[in-house]
């Protein structure tokens, strides 16, 4: 009786008083010194399982938890002391390894459990399926599904939710939806998992269908945030902002995913005032601006032309990661602040933030817009040798654009011909644009020929060559290029523009007189034209 009471007391201590792994070690030492492991096997098993269970409860969230060899070696040694592990014991050690992001070990223990003919229960399969989701292990997941059906666990919401998650992670969205559709019970996680699967698969219409079918009372911040992120990622910015307006009407709490998605849409749509209101909400709610939100705010204000505000937010943020630096650099590049951009790049390097391909894309674009040719040459040359960043087609395209704009057509052509990969439409198009600017017909013809090979349906190249021939007064060639365009039945894609009237953003194309707001649009455009004329 005394040993039994000691055993019970120590289990209570483990559950209620252990606040660190060190405390667990201390209780474990007491169990050994008091000889409690020599008790009846079932009592010893309860104690050892309680140790593992308490260990699991002390593990921090997965992103903050790199697997540590001491952790799982200790857990293994404790588990191996259990003579006849019960289903609960096996479930506990399997869960330990999913929590430690060691899914292979979790599956190993599950296999050992089945080999010993220990029956699974409703908790076993969710833990194993979490391991499958971490590994994108489709074949094992299918086996688990069969076993779940055999043991009658497919009615369990946790089994179904985790099975849907595995299928979504493996890109089997059809199988995922089938499990979701046939599930007897659904909770908010059920909807959020399949919604996330559709969003990641860029099936935004099906995602919206699930969202609309979901009871409003069941939706949580994750539901709304996932849907908003889906719209932002698939460039359905107007739908994103419309859905956000619904959130405001329903007083739905915002999470960071929602805020970032809406700021992204506002930046793309030029919705400065709406984005400012989102920023005001962040201030009123006293939401801490971490690197995630800092990046979104800097990107939004930069895209809307409010560079000083973007700078202020960036400088005030104590947590500047690579993405925040890139947002600041790209924002400066977009608006031609070349010298300032280079200063920020120097600060970034001094702060030991390693640049990546996006960083150099922003730097090269900024140098191109500001005409900083020598600086661009130097940094382009240092990408691989100094910073270890491989040059991609987009970087060569930026250099081609910079050199061609500056009239260095020969240098641009030599660079393109020496590239380790074939040029794409962007690279050759940059060269062609420079040729039009500087009237180099010979190189323009070579660039145009390559573009026609790569993208025969591109109508813009014919228009550009027509302009080049017209400027050079080569009327016969102008006639030939137009006939070639007509014979190939190539049409130039109409460009579109965006304009705001009374707070509403409208999209239109040149010469559009069918738009319901065409009169108001052209009045605004005329006013812009007059203002530009007055400003010189």
Language-model features: where?
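Terminal (and in a subset, N-terminal) low-complexity or junction segments at the ends
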Residues: 1-96, 100, 104-187, 196-216, ...
């Amino acid at each position: 009786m005394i040993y039994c009471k000691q055993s019970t007391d120590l289990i209570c201590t483990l559950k209620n008083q252990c606040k660190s792994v060190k405390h667990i070690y201390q209780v474990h030492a007491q169990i050994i010194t008091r000889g409690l492991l020599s008790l009846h096997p079932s009592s010893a098993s309860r104690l050892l399982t309680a140790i593992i269970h308490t260990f699991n409860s002390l593990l921090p969230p997965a992103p903050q938890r790199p697997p540590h060899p001491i952790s799982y070696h200790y857990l293994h040694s404790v588990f191996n002391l259990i003579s006849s592990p019960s289903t609960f014991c096996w479930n506990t050690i399997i869960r330990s390894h999913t929590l430690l992001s060691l899914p292979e070990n979790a599956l190993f223990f599950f296999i050992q459990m089945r080999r010993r003919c220990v029956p699974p229960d409703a908790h076993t399969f969710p833990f194993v399926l979490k391991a499958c989701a971490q590994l994108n292990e489709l074949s094992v997941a299918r086996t688990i599904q069969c076993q779940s059906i055999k043991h009658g666990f497919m009615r369990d919401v946790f089994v179904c939710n985790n099975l849907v998650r595995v299928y979504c992670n493996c890109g089997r969205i059809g199988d995922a939806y089938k499990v979701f559709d046939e599930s007897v019970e659904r909770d908010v996680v059920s909807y959020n998992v399949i919604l996330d699967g559709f969003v990641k698969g860029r099936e935004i219409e099906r995602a919206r269908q699930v969202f609309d079918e979901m009871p409003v009372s069941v939706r949580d911040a994750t539901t709304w945030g996932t849907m908003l992120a889906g719209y932002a990622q698939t460039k359905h910015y107007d739908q994103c902002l419309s859905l956000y307006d619904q959130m405001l009407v329903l007083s739905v709490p915002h999470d960071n995913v929602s805020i970032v998605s809406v700021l992204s849409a506002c930046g793309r749509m030029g919705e400065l005032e709406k984005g400012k209101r989102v920023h005001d909400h962040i201030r009123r709610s006293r939401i801490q601006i971490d690197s995630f939100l800092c990046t979104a705010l800097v990107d939004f204000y930069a895209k809307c032309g409010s560079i000083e505000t973007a700078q202020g937010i960036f400088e005030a943020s104590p947590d500047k990661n690579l993405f925040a630096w890139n947002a600041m650099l790209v924002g400066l590049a977009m608006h031609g602040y070349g010298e300032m951009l280079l200063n920020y790049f120097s600060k970034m390097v001094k702060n030991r933030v390693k640049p990546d391909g996006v960083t150099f894309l922003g730097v090269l674009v900024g140098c191109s817009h500001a005409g900083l040719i020598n600086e661009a040459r130097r940094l382009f040359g240092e990408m691989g040798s100094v910073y270890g960043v491989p040059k991609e087609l987009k970087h060569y395209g930026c250099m081609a654009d910079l050199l061609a704009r500056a009239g260095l057509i020969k240098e641009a052509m030599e660079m393109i011909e020496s590239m380790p990969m074939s040029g794409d439409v962007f690279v050759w198009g940059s060269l062609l644009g420079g040729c039009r600017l500087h009237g180099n017909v010979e190189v323009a013809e070579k660039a145009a020929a390559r573009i026609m090979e790569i993208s025969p349906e591109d109508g813009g190249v014919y228009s550009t060559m027509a302009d080049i021939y017209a400027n050079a007064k080569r009327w016969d060639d102008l006639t030939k290029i137009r006939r070639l365009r007509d014979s190939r039945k190539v049409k130039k894609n109409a460009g579109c523009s965006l304009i705001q009237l009374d707070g509403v953003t409208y999209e239109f194309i040149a010469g559009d007189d069918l738009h319901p707001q065409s009169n108001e649009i052209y009045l605004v455009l005329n006013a812009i034209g007059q203002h530009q004329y007055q400003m010189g």
